[in-house]
């Protein structure tokens, strides 16, 4: 079975803790991602997702141009070691009710894996391989 490190994205998109929710949403749109790592003084302090924006800001009727990412982010980032299986990541996401996991290598954050990344990995495993003899 594939490992989390094989399914993860290494190109981590980030925003600062004091960025507005509006700015973060535009960054997600422009970069075509569903989450951003949140940094403060070069340290990852959380993650903000599309779901966070919808549930914790938009649905509350908040002014997205005045609300900061820090007020709606999830902190700390839930992580999984990269050598674990994609099934382990799937189970962890289900158990914890999250759609994104930070991927670590001996405790250092090296990537991010989303539900979408797992679906792509599961699909590639389950598709029959066509070979020519």
Task: Please place each PLM-identified region on the residue numbering.
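A glycine-centered beta-loop-beta connector
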Residues: 28-31, 36-52, 93, 101-116
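Short, charge-rich, low-complexity interaction segments located
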Residues: 60-67, 87, 127
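Short beta-to-alpha loop/turn elements within the nucleotide-binding domains of ABC transporters
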Residues: 2, 19, 48, 67, ...
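Phosphate-coordinating loops and pocket residues in cytosolic domains that bind phosphorylated ligands
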Residues: 9, 55, 59, 74, ...
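The conserved cystathionine-beta-synthase
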Residues: 14-32, 79-97, 104, 122
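Bateman (tandem CBS) regulatory domains
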Residues: 2-12, 66-77
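Cytosolic regulatory modules rich in charged/polar residues
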Residues: 82, 104-110, 114-133
